């Protein structure tokens, strides 16, 4: 007789093949039709709020692996918090102003842009930004990210711009905004000032030259520079007051350098010398050297920032081309020379170099220095150099009139530092990082010489040329913006923009013209706490900001400065950061290396759940690695998780909630499995709370593959398949499988949003329209029997000893399948022996063998001695266990008594 039809074989529509690429878009459509975002929020009305505020990605292209990772991490947080019972809204946003967009539009428009008005350029920029908002929105939705996609916040929205200007007015009112002629980062390609956060460092080849300035007849002070083009602006040479300096004789000349750099300098320049004098740097103060090619003198000044790392300890100083140089210039009342125009071309003030591009001038200046006999050494060096974040070209320091935020006025910096201490930083080193940055940061350059941005409503007096900010002008403009947007600044006349009664603070006249600088985009996004959260009555400060760790100098910093200036408190309670994404070998991704991973390719090939699983697998607090092999590993892990879900669903096809067996009636093994589930829920919950998703991933992966598939589910397979459908033996195991499946689906739901939904819809416990309306599994202490947990901890260790012995017997051809075996075991100590005796009735099931005898074993394991031999009797044709009682039943001659009783309906 074929007994296959008498077995309780698994059956489910949850297929082994995931087919995520086809199924996921169908689920997204279904969620959209049910309005899942609002449906889920409504279900949590009146509950405690959890607000994660979205840092806006830039709307200037397709999403990349970094933005995809960031959005998935945020989605995991929101979904988990929602399941924990929080009212957790998620309003996505986009950064839509600024240079990157204007640059792209300029490239697309080509020569046409020269004939376009500012308003026309702004309109093109707006269209470009809104197009990519739509593109990115669909791409994020395809990743399974849930949010208020129909109502995102956009920094170009007039309602948003109004709040930018109101916060700007607060800064003006508090005296934190000033105009100054200071050296700032300047991009000659994009022709605009840049803030520190808009500068990236890349390797760059620069000239490295040693030049001598004549101090007195036949005596020279030697400087070193990697920017020869700044020499026309040199007005001083800085030395350290406390360093020792030496006068050395080289040929018939005397040169001055720092003693601490003498050996390095001599080796690089290949000179022979003798030391003739030694003195402190402060002894050189106020002496004057002759500029090598400009008709002026260079003052010797003192500066503590001079180091003994490179060069000569005598630092070329041009206040118009360096932040430290500028401060030294103020101290010594030096002129701020910057003979370079917005395109990086020398002006007439550079003398013979006028009209030359600065990078081309390097070569000419070096040649001239050589002709003048003052060039000691010239070579090339590779070093890290600042580049524009948008065009990727090198930037310069250039003194120009700009608007700045003073970070020290009114104690702003100190207040920010105090607020940083109150924030919870994940990882903890984030606090040290942002603290160091805030302590060291210079005043903030906030003006940009571009049209696509929030205009700075500054006006210029036609009579005396004074450029200033007036609160009445700002107030009037705020009212106009709410109705007409910031284009109004470019469209309306001065009479419409400037209210009556405004007078020039310098000369008292009232004839003005507009200026056209726009605000740094970091001001835009830094004001989101007000525009998106506080002004709408949302919870403030918010619970969480979650971004890449580059935002310590970007959005985290701009937000806390704006918030403290406007509200006196930090805008966030907690900050979580993730690292940069690199390839499998830890290299930066680049098109030239061919190692760029496109999230769209992963989603199109494997499905979004695979990408989401990868995101959960990474220890994202550190730098993150991804590549084809790593993604393939996630595909394999996913298959194991899916197969576990499928097995559980398949074996619960005839099980309903009313069939649940009370805990006290469960079999001991099932009690252990249910208790272990509580431990897993507790550990997973703890990891979610700490944003340690890689630990969630590892724990659930091990739980499914080792503890369930290879252990518990393998052990109970006999009971599930062979025992009577409604028997206590089967229902006891099914009860625990029910709880495991229910909890597993819920714990996977924030990560595998699509797979969890698919499994939930086919589960016996479905009670909501979507799994994402479900609540997080709770730890039930009453399901933890401490004695059972302790006993089975040992039993599973004993099982490991037995499995090793079975494997050895298999190699020796004593057995084939483990059910061919009879095992004899004995504990190696009294405690082990006691546990064996106590649970002897279940040991054959746990070891998956036909018979277990307690007695002296031949092979010593760690906890028991084991003997494996061929089981006695015949093989039952239904359960495959060996028994000496096979054939004793008159009706079923080839099965064991247990199977005969099942077939007759006698086993309950």
Curated annotation (Swiss-Prot):
Cofactor note: Binds 1 zinc ion per subunit.
Motif annotated as 'KMSKS' region, chain positions: 588-592
Domain of life: Bacteria
Binding sites annotated in the UniProt record for Zn(2+): 876, 879, 896, 899
UniProt subcellular location: Cytoplasm
GO cellular component annotations of the record: cytosol
Main location: cytoplasm
Binding positions for ATP per the UniProt entry: 591
Cofactor(s), names only, from the UniProt record: Zn(2+)
The enzyme's E.C. designation: 6.1.1.5
GO terms, molecular function: aminoacyl-tRNA deacylase activity; ATP binding; isoleucine-tRNA ligase activity; tRNA binding; zinc ion binding
Annotated positions binding L-isoleucyl-5'-AMP: 547
Keywords (A to Z) from UniProt: Aminoacyl-tRNA synthetase, ATP-binding, Cytoplasm, Ligase, Metal-binding, Nucleotide-binding, Protein biosynthesis, Zinc
GO BP term, pick one: isoleucyl-tRNA aminoacylation
InterPro entries: aa-tRNA-synth_I_CS, aa-tRNA-synth_Ia, Anticodon_Ile_BEm, Ile-tRNA-ligase, Ile-tRNA-ligase_type1, Ile-tRNA_ligase, M/V/L/I-tRNA-synth_anticd-bd, Rossmann-like_a/b/a_fold
Catalytic activity: tRNA(Ile) + L-isoleucine + ATP = L-isoleucyl-tRNA(Ile) + AMP + diphosphate
Entry keyword Protein biosynthesis: yes
NCBIfam families named among the record's database cross-references: ileS
Record's comment describing the protein's domains: IleRS has two distinct active sites: one for aminoacylation and one for editing. The misactivated valine is translocated from the active site to the editing site, which sterically excludes the correctly activated isoleucine. The single editing site contains two valyl binding pockets, one specific for each substrate (Val-AMP or Val-tRNA(Ile)).
Family note: Belongs to the class-I aminoacyl-tRNA synthetase family. IleS type 1 subfamily.
Function of the protein: Catalyzes the attachment of isoleucine to tRNA(Ile). As IleRS can inadvertently accommodate and process structurally similar amino acids such as valine, to avoid such errors it has two additional distinct tRNA(Ile)-dependent editing activities. One activity is designated as 'pretransfer' editing and involves the hydrolysis of activated Val-AMP. The other activity is designated 'posttransfer' editing and involves deacylation of mischarged Val-tRNA(Ile).
PANTHER family: ISOLEUCINE--TRNA LIGASE, MITOCHONDRIAL, SOLEUCYL-TRNA SYNTHETASE
Protein name from the UniProt record: Isoleucine--tRNA ligase
Designated gene of the protein: ileS
């Amino acid at each position: 007789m074929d007994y296959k039809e008498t077995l309780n074989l698994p059956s489910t529509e949850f297929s082994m093949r995931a087919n995520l690429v086809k199924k996921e878009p169908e689920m997204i459509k279904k969620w959209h039709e049910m309005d899942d975002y609002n449906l889920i929020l409504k279900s949590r009305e009146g509950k405690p709020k959890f607000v994660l505020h979205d840092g806006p990605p830039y709307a200037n292209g397709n999403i990349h692996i970094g933005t995809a990772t960031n959005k998935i991490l945020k989605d995991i947080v929101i979904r988990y918090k929602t399941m924990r019972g929080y009212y957790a809204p998620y309003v996505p946003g986009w950064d839509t102003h600024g240079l990157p967009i204007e640059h792209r539009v300029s490239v697309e428009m080509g020569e046409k842009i020269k004939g376009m008005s500012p308003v026309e350029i702004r309109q093109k920029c707006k269209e470009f930004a809104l197009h990519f908002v739509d593109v990115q929105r669909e791409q994020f939705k395809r990743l399974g990210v849930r949010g208020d996609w129909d109502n995102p916040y956009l920094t170009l929205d007039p309602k948003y711009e109004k709040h930018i200007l109101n916060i700007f007015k607060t800064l003006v009112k508090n005296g934190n905004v000033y105009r100054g002629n200071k050296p700032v980062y300047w991009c000659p390609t994009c022709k605009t000032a840049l803030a520190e956060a808009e500068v990236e460092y890349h390797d760059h080849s620069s000239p490295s030259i040693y030049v001598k300035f004549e101090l007195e007849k036949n005596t020279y002070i030697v400087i070193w520079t990697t920017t020869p083009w700044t020499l026309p602006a040199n007005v001083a040479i800085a030395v350290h007051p406390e360093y020792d300096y030496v006068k050395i004789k080289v040929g018939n000349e005397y040169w001055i350098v720092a003693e601490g750099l003498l050996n390095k300098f001599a080796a690089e320049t290949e000179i022979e010398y003798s030391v003739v004098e030694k003195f402190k740097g402060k002894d050189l103060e106020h002496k004057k050297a002759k500029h090598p090619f400009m008709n002026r003198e260079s003052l010797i000044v003192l500066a503590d920032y001079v180091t003994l790392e490179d060069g000569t300890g005598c630092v070329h100083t041009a206040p118009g081309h360096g932040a430290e140089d500028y401060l030294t210039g103020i101290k010594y009342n030096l002129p701020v020379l910057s003979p370079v125009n917005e395109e990086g071309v020398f002006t007439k003030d550079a003398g013979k170099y006028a009209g030359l591009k600065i990078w081309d001038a390097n070569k000419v200046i070096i040649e001239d220095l050589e002709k003048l006999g003052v060039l000691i050494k010239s070579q090339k060096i590779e070093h890290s150099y600042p580049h524009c974040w948008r065009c990727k070209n090198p930037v310069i320091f250039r003194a120009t009139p700009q608007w700045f935020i003073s970070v020290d006025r009114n104690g702003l910096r100190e207040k920010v530092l105090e607020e940083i201490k109150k924030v919870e930083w994940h990882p903890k080193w984030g606090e040290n990082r942002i603290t160091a940055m805030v302590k060291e940061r210079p005043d903030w350059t906030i003006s940009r010489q571009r049209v696509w941005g929030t205009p700075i409503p500054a006006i210029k007096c036609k009579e005396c040329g004074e450029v200033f900010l007036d609160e009445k002008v700002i107030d009037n403009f705020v009212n106009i913006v709410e109705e007409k947007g910031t284009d109004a600044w470019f469209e309306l006349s001065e009479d419409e923009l400037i209210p009556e009664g405004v007078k020039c603070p310098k000369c008292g006249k009232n004839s003005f013209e507009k200026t056209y600088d726009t605000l740094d985009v970091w001001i835009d996004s830094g004001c989101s706490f007000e525009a998106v959260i506080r002004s709408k009555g949302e919870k403030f400060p918010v619970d969480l900001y979650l971004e890449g760790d580059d935002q310590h100098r970007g959005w985290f910093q701009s937000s806390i400065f704006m918030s403290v200036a406007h509200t006196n408190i930090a805008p966030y309670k907690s900050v979580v950061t993730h690292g940069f994404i690199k390839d499998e070998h830890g290299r930066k991704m680049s098109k030239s290396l061919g190692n760029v991973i496109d999230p769209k390719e992963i989603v199109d090939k494997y499905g979004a759940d695979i990408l989401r699983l990868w995101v959960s697998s990474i220890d994202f607090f550190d730098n993150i690695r991804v590549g084809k092999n790593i993604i393939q590993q996630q595909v394999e892990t996913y298959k194991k998780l899916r197969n576990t879900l499928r097995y559980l669903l398949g074996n619960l096809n005839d099980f309903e909630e009313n069939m649940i067996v009370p805990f006290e009636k469960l079999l001991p093994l099932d009690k252990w499995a249910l208790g272990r589930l509580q431990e897993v829920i507790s550990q997973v919950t703890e990891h979610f709370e700490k944003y340690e998703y890689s630990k969630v991933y590892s724990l659930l992966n091990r739980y499914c593959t080792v503890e369930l598939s290879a252990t518990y589910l393998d052990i109970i397979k006999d009971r599930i398949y062979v025992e009577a459908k409604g028997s206590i033996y089967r229902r006891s195991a099914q009860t625990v499988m029910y709880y495991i499946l229910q909890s597993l689906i819920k714990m996977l739901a924030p990560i595998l949003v699509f797979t969890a939904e698919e499994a939930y819809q086919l589960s016996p416990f479905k009670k909501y329209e979507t799994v994402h309306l479900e609540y997080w599994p709770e730890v039930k202490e009453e399901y933890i029997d401490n004695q059972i947990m302790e006993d089975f901890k040992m039993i599973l260790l004993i099982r490991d000893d037995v499995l090793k012995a079975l494997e050895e017997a298999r190699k020796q051809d004593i057995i084939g399948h483990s059910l061919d075996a009879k095992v004899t075991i004995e504990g190696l100590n009294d405690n082990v022996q006691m546990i064996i005796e106590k649970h002897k009735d279940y040991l054959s099931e746990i070891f998956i063998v036909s018979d277990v005898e307690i007695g002296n074993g031949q092979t010593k394991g760690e906890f028991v001695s084991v003997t494996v031999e061929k089981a006695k009797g015949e093989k039952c044709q239904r359960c495959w266990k060996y028994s000496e009682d096979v054939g004793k039943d008159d009706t079923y001659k080839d099965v064991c008594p247990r199977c005969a009783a099942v077939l007759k309906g006698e086993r309950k």
